[in-house]
Amino acid sequence: QFLKNKIKSLDAIIYTHEHADQTSGIFEMRPFFWKNKKKIPIYGSSRTIKALTSNYTFCFSPRHGYKPIMEANIVKNKFQIKKKNKVLSVTAFDVIHGMIKATGFLFKKVAYISDCNKIPKESLKNLYNLEYLVIDCLKMDKHPSHFNYHDALKLIQLVQPKKTILTNLHTDLDYDY
């Protein structure tokens, strides 16, 4: 997708959680470092950053003459991503993804929640008055770690964003449903 869309640089990478389906592409970020000659900042919860720096040591520590390609940043609540004169303010909040805490992100009036099956009450406050809600919707049937179609609809009805984008749709959910 990077090649097809002619993406030449990355300002940052934000990780929602440490599962392999979210993190395994980290190795593919090396060309951005090689081209731009500067570390790529990554952001995530302390749990996620700990897993990434442990599982992908070569990205964060010098080894065998290779420079680290990434700079790890632990997020707790509000943080900023800076590039030249521009600043992107981001709010991180907890969501539940099965047996772990994952992270949802709020960018002004856009919320992104990729993998979750429950949103704690204290995190819900971030989801009102949204222009866009990007929300997990894996299947029609119940799932132990993801919202299903009915869970997603309940959340949409509760927070009433102007527009919603369902993500993580599995093969049993037709994209034209």
Regions found by a protein language model. Give the residues of each.
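Active-site neighborhood of divalent metal-dependent phosphoester bond hydrolases
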Residues: 36-40, 48-72
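Hydrophobic/aromatic beta-strand patches that form the interior of the parallel beta-sheet core
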Residues: 14, 43, 73, 91, ...
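Short, glycine/charged-enriched secondary-structure capping and boundary segments
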Residues: 6-7, 27-31, 56-59, 105, ...
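Active-site metal-binding motif and surrounding structural segment of the metallo-beta-lactamase
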Residues: 1-44, 131-132
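Core dinuclear metal-dependent hydrolase active-site scaffold
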Residues: 1-5, 69-125
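Divalent metal-coordination and catalytic microenvironments
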Residues: 2, 17, 42, 52, ...
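Structural motif
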Residues: 12, 109-112, 132, 163
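Cap/insert and terminal regions of metallo-dependent hydrolase folds
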Residues: 118-177
